[in-house]
């Protein structure tokens, strides 16, 4: 949720943000109008309430016919107060409805445009050239080494489901363990998070539970399956006042994640690039507004550290405004090279959500002045970033493959696989 006061005082920057996203600018003026209506309705209600209280004192002192006349006026005034209260509540609801629609304010420097308008910030490593043999794709390799079984995944659960077995299961567990250990070393608190959340938690994080076709819902229980542990970690401190005096609060959540992939018909139908269920280690940070940008850079650095450990060539992109999603004010993606696709594919994403999620979830910090005296509260900033996920297996298998289909294990991962240096062909 955006800051209404900031929007009212600086409407042009919010209009510019909407333009950068390719979104409707008129919502800015609609919110300003709704806020004006809300304020006017509230003033009317408070004025009538004051009159009602004053009349109460007059009635108490009056006698006879005067009292009867005043009682009639009090009754009429009570009806007016009730109507004004309903008007104020309706105006408040209208404003809140509009605030649920407008996305976060993008920060300065974010590229304008849509999915293809990203800016490449840097490229690290060189895509492997296969001069001696034709590279196999990750599914063919996964079947050769007994790591991936798509056929039985489809038999059991349907399309875009799979089994990781043998070295495939071990490789994913190794990746997640290495990621979690790195996070712990960086000061993150490890968390195993719920994968089912209430609608208010999903909405508070920035998802539209009514219209988002990507979300699985358990209608009977009114619970939603998360597509990332970011949702549960964001809701963890809902309606709380945090102490950030000692620095950011950092959590690393591990969970299964679920996505319907409703808009992906025909895309990435082979293998495990785009699936309905996967596992992930997600970093999540609560910090001050002033520290948010620096924390965003740190999250990116931790993601790059993991990519380096896996010895993968990659690039970092600054995602364009129209591809940010509801909550993000800025997002960096790390994309690893996938040889058989001759393309970079996203492995990590890190977003600075500024105060957007915190306002929705009512997460605040206490403001202390220079004299050490508390001066109220304000919204915190939240950030998130992927540290490892099932999709990494795609890039690892393809980039580190040998002519026979076996796969060299990146050195940093070997200790998590019992010293295994090569994933052999069965």
Curated annotation (Swiss-Prot):
Pfam families: Seryl_tRNA_N, tRNA-synt_2b
Subcellular location: Cytoplasm
Keyword Iron included in the entry's annotation: no
PROSITE patterns attached to this UniProt entry: AA_TRNA_LIGASE_II
Enzyme Commission designation: 6.1.1.11
Residues the record lists as binding L-serine: 228-230, 282, 386
Keywords: Aminoacyl-tRNA synthetase, ATP-binding, Cytoplasm, Ligase, Nucleotide-binding, Protein biosynthesis
Pathway noted in the entry: Aminoacyl-tRNA biosynthesis; selenocysteinyl-tRNA(Sec) biosynthesis; L-seryl-tRNA(Sec) from L-serine and tRNA(Sec): step 1/1
Catalyzed chemical reaction(s): tRNA(Ser) + L-serine + ATP = L-seryl-tRNA(Ser) + AMP + diphosphate + H(+); tRNA(Sec) + L-serine + ATP = L-seryl-tRNA(Sec) + AMP + diphosphate + H(+)
CDD domains in alphabetical order: SerRS_core
Record-linked InterPro entries: aa-tRNA-synt_IIb, aa-tRNA-synth_II, aa-tRNA-synth_II/BPL/LPL, Ser-tRNA-ligase_type_1, Ser-tRNA-synth_1_N, SerRS_1_N_sf, SerRS_core, tRNA-bd_arm
Recorded GO MF terms: ATP binding; serine-tRNA ligase activity
Residues involved in ATP binding: 259-261, 275, 346-349
Biased composition (Basic and acidic residues): 1-15
Gene Ontology CC annotation, any one: cytoplasm
SUPFAM superfamilies: Class II aaRS and biotin synthetases, tRNA-binding arm
Positions of region (Disordered): 1-20
Entry keyword annotation includes DNA repair: no
GO BP, one annotated term: selenocysteine biosynthetic process
Family of this protein: Belongs to the class-II aminoacyl-tRNA synthetase family. Type-1 seryl-tRNA synthetase subfamily.
Assembly mode: Homodimer. The tRNA molecule binds across the dimer.
Domain remark in the UniProt entry: Consists of two distinct domains, a catalytic core and a N-terminal extension that is involved in tRNA binding.
General function of this protein: Catalyzes the attachment of serine to tRNA(Ser). Is also able to aminoacylate tRNA(Sec) with serine, to form the misacylated tRNA L-seryl-tRNA(Sec), which will be further converted into selenocysteinyl-tRNA(Sec).
PANTHER family listed in its UniProt record: SERYL-TRNA SYNTHETASE
Protein's UniProt name: Serine--tRNA ligase
Organism: Paenarthrobacter aurescens (strain TC1)
């Amino acid at each position: 949720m955006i800051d209404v006061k900031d929007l009212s005082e600086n409407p042009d920057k919010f209009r510019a943000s909407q333009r950068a996203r390719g979104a409707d600018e008129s919502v800015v003026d609609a919110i300003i109008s709704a806020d004006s209506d809300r304020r006017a309705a509230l003033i009317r209600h408070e004025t009538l309430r004051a009159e009602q209280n004053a009349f109460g004192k007059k009635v108490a002192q009056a006698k006879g016919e005067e009292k009867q006349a005043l009682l009639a006026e009090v009754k009429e005034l009570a009806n007016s107060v009730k109507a004004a209260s309903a008007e104020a509540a309706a105006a408040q609801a209208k404003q809140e409805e509009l605030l649920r629609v407008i996305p976060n304010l993008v920060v300065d420097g974010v590229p304008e445009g849509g999915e293809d308008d990203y800016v490449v910030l840097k490229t690290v490593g060189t895509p492997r050239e296969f001069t001696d043999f034709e590279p196999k794709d990750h599914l063919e390799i996964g079947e050769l080494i007994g790591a991936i079984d798509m056929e039985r995944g489809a038999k059991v659960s349907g399309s875009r489901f799979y089994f990781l077995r043998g070295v495939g299961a071990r490789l994913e567990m190794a990746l997640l363990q290495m990621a979690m250990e790195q996070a712990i070393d960086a000061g993150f608190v490890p968390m195993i998070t719920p994968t089912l959340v209430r609608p208010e938690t999903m909405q508070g994080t920035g998802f539209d539970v009514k219209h988002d076709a990507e979300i699985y819902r358990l209608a009977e229980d009114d619970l939603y399956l998360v597509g990332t542990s970011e949702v549960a970690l964001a809701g963890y401190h809902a309606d709380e006042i945090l102490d950030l005096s000692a620095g950011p609060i950092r959590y690393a959540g591990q969970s299964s994640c679920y996505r319907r992939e409703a808009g992906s018909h025909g895309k990435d139908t082979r293998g495990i690039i785009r699936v309905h269920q996967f596992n992930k280690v997600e970093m999540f940070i609560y910090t001050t507004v002033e520290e948010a940008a620096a924390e965003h850079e740190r999250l990116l650095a931790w993601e790059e550290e993991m990519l380096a450990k896996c010895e993968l060539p990659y690039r970092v992109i600054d995602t364009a405004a129209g591809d940010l999603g509801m909550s993000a004010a800025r997002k960096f993606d790390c994309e690893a090279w996938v040889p058989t696709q001759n393309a970079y594919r996203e492995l990590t994403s890190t977003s600075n959500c500024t105060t957007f999620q915190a306002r929705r979830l009512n997460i605040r910090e206490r403001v202390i002045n220079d004299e050490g005296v508390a001066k109220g509260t304000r919204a915190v900033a939240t950030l998130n970033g992927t540290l490892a996920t099932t999709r990494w297996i795609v890039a690892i298998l393809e980039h580190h493959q040998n002519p026979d289909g076996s796969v060299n294990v990146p050195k940093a991962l070997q200790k998590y696989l019992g010293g295994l240096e090569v994933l052999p062909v069965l």
